[in-house]
Structures are given as structure tokens and as C-alpha cells.
Amino acid sequence: MTSAPDFADWLAVANLKARYCRHLDTKDWSAFASLFAEDVVIDTTAAGGPRMEGRETAVSRIRASLDAATTVHQVHSPEIEIDGNEARAVWAMQDRVAWSNGRKLDGAGHYHERYVRENGEWRIAESRLTRLYVEMQPSD
């Protein structure tokens, strides 16, 4: 059975990931950056993307890639494990991205993540994206 403190942390991690999707899709880059540990590692190589190290580098690259696109990120079915000031989770995900030149992406897969608690706040320390499905429509 999950204890009350663990459940509060579970909810905090789930809310962190919900904010990740919302801030990314609304292009609130300052709020988006605040979700990550300073030394975050974001690895999208399994999905054909880059490996990014450090908050500033990661947010800058994500912003450059998606700032002009309309995006919808959805996560669900979390498997969250809390261990003191660290947590791990696997999230089922789906994303849709549409660029103004007509290029579109529709994808699904999983985020595999590690979180750390810093000064009482949960932050994303590692994120690895794997894809099960990708459909790309080339630009016009």
C-alpha cells in the first residue's frame, strides 16, 4: 500500500509531467525550463532526435525545433515509483506536431524519466523518448 507522503509525491510528479505538456504546447519557455534540473539529460536518439545535456541547451534546442509549430502532447498511464528524493516513471505518450509549411508528425510511444527533488520541488533529471508509432507528412 502506498503511504500518504508517497502518494503526495506521486501526485507532485504527475502534476510536473502535466505542466511539461502544457508549458511545451503553450510555448511558455520560462515555465518549461523551470521543470528541469540544471544538469538534465534529454535523450531522443531512439526516436531519431538528439541527446541534449543541461537545461539551457535542452530548452534552447526544443524551442528552436517547436516554437513555430502547433503541438499537442498527451501523457497517460503513468508507472511512478518514489524512492526518497528520487522518482522514476514511464509514461505512455502521444504527440501531434504541425508546422506552418504543412509538415506534420503524429507519434506515440513512451517517456522513461527520472526525477529529483530539489529544494522541496520535483524536477525532471532525465528523460528518454522511445517511439512505437510515427507517421510523418512531408512539407508542402
Predicted regions and their residues:
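Short, surface-exposed coil-to-beta transition loops
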Residues: 73-75, 106-111
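Short, cysteine-centered beta-strand-loop-beta hairpins and adjacent loop/turn segments enriched
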Residues: 68, 96-104, 134
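Short, low-complexity N-terminal intrinsically disordered segments enriched in polar/charged residues
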Residues: 1-38
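A solvent-exposed, acidic/Ser-Thr-rich amphipathic alpha-helical stretch
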Residues: 30-95
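Transmembrane beta-barrel outer-membrane domains
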Residues: 11, 69-71, 104-106
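Short, solvent-exposed loop/turn segments at secondary-structure junctions
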Residues: 94-96, 129-130
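Short beta-strand edge/turn micro-motifs at domain boundaries
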Residues: 88, 108-138
